C-alpha cells in the first residue's frame, strides 16, 4: 500500500421525502480494515493520476470579496487537537449540505474524508462519491441488482496538502481539486463549501514553461536532434514529477538539462519575461506538445511526433499544406480499400 491511513469516515447526504437534503452522520471512524485500505489506496492512485487538476488555497473570492472560513477553521481546530476527527467531519458534512441546498441539481452522495500520509506529506482527502447500480450472479445463478461506490469516476474531490499548508501559509497551491467536465463551474459548490479559491493557473504556467523551452532551444547552438532531445528531457522530467505528485522545480529542471550538456536554462527562464513561478504543478496535456503536434478541425485529426517535422512530415505555411512521407500501414490499407471501392 502506498499510503498510511490515519483516519477515515463516510457520511451520507441525501434527499428526504420532501426533497430536502439531510445528513446521516456516522458516529465513529471507519475501521482500518482491508476494505478501507484498498478503497483509499485506489482513490489515492486514481486522484494522483488525474490530469488537469486545479490548485488553490483557503482565501477570499476576488469577485465578491466573500470568505467562507468555516471549513478551514474547523480543520485548524482538528489539527490543534481541539476537535475530534468525527466531530470535524460532521461539521464539514453540515457545511456541504448547506452549500448543496443552494442548488437545484444536487442529489447528494456519500462524503468521504480521510487523513493519510504519502511519502513525507500529510493529506486530507475529501470526496463526494456517488453510488452506481450493477448486476451480480448469486450462488443459485439468479441475477441480483446492487449498488456500489463509483470509485473510478470521481468528479467531486479535493486534497489538502496539510504539510505544505502548515509550513507555508502564503502558498497558493496546497489544495488540489478535480475540475468538472465542463470546467470549474461544475464543481464550484464543492470548492465553496471548503472556502477554496483557485490560486495557480497550472495550464498557463506549463504553457509558459513550454514557450521558454522553445525560445531556449531556438537561441542555442544545438543541432536539430539535440533540440528535440532537450524537449524530450523536459517532458520526461515533468512527467516523472506528475507521476510522483510533486511540483516542477525550475532550478531542478535546469540542473537536469545541464547534466545533458544544456547549460544556463535557469538563468534564461528567470531572466526573461516569462513570469514563471519557482515551483508549480505539472500538466501533462500541455507539456505533451513538446513531443507531439496534434490538431483537429474540419473533420480532420492529425497527430505526429515532433521529431518527424521536416523529415517524414513537411509543413509548407505558404501553401497551407502538410506532406506526409511514409503513410502509416493501417491508414494506407484503409485508403487503398476505399480507392478500390470507388
UniProtKB/Swiss-Prot annotation:
Q: Where are the transmembrane segments?
A: none
Subcellular location per the Swiss-Prot or TrEMBL entry: Cytoplasm, Nucleoid
Tree of life domain: Bacteria
Using the UniProt record, give the first listed, main subcellular location: cytoplasm
Answer yes or no on keyword Acyltransferase. Answer: no
Protein name per UniProt: Nucleoid-associated protein Sputw3181_1720
Identify the GO cellular component terms for this protein: bacterial nucleoid; cytoplasm
Q: Which UniProt keywords apply?
A: Cytoplasm
Q: Do you know which InterPro entries this protein is assigned to?
A: Nucleoid_associated_NdpA
Q: Which family does it belong to?
A: Belongs to the YejK family.
Q: Which Gene Ontology MF annotations are present? A: double-stranded DNA binding; single-stranded RNA binding
Pfam family of the protein (one): NA37
Query: What HAMAP family does the entry give?
Result: NdpA
Amino acid at each position: 500500500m502506498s499510503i498510511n491511513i490515519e483516519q477515515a469516515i463516510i457520511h451520507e447526504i441525501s434527499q428526504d421525502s420532501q426533497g430536502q437534503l439531510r445528513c446521516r452522520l456516522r458516529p465513529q471512524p471507519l475501521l482500518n480494515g482491508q476494505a478501507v485500505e484498498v478503497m483509499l489506496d485506489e482513490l489515492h492512485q486514481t486522484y494522483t493520476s488525474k490530469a488537469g487538476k486545479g490548485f488553490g488555497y483557503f482565501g477570499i473570492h476576488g469577485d465578491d470579496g466573500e470568505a467562507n472560513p468555516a471549513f478551514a477553521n474547523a480543520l485548524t481546530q482538528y489539527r490543534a487537537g481541539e476537535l475530534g476527527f468525527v466531530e470535524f467531519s460532521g461539521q464539514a458534512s453540515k457545511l456541504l449540505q448547506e452549500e448543496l441546498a443552494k442548488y437545484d441539481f444536487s442529489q447528494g452522495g456519500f462524503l468521504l474524508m480521510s487523513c493519510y500520509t504519502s511519502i513525507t506529506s500529510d493529506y486530507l482527502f475529501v470526496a463526494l462519491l456517488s453510488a452506481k447500480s450493477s448486476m451480480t450472479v448469486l450462488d443459485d445463478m439468479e441475477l441480483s441488482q446492487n449498488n456500489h461506490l463509483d470509485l473510478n469516476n470521481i468528479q467531486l474531490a479535493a486534497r489538502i496538502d496539510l504539510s505544505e499548508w502548515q509550513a507555508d501559509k502564503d502558498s497558493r497551491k496546497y489544495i488540489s481539486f478535480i475540475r468538472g467536465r465542463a470546467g470549474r463551474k461544475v464543481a464550484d459548490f464543492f470548492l465553496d463549501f471548503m472556502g477554496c479559491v483557485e490560486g495557480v493557473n497550472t495550464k498557463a504556467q506549463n504553457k509558459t514553461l513550454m514557450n521558454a523551452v522553445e525560445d531556449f532551444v531556438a537561441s542555442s547552438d544545438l543541432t536539430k536532434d539535440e533540440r528535440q532531445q532537450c524537449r524530450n528531457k523536459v517532458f520526461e522530467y515533468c512527467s516523472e514529477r506528475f507521476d510522483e505528485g510533486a511540483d516542477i522545480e525550475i532550478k531542478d529542471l535546469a540542473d537536469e538539462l545541464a547534466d545533458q550538456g544544456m547549460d544556463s536554462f535557469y538563468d534564461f527562464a528567470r531572466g526573461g519575461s516569462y513570469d514563471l513561478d519557482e515551483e508549480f504543478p505539472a500538466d501533462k496535456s500541455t507539456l505533451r506538445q513538446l513531443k507531439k503536434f496534434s490538431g483537429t478541425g474540419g473533420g480532420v485529426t492529425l497527430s505526429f511526433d515532433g521529431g518527424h517535422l521536416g523529415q517524414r512530415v513537411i509543413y509548407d505555411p505558404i501553401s497551407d499544406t502538410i506532406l506526409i512521407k511514409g503513410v502509416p500501414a493501417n491508414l494506407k490499407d484503409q485508403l487503398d480499400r476505399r480507392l478500390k471501392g470507388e
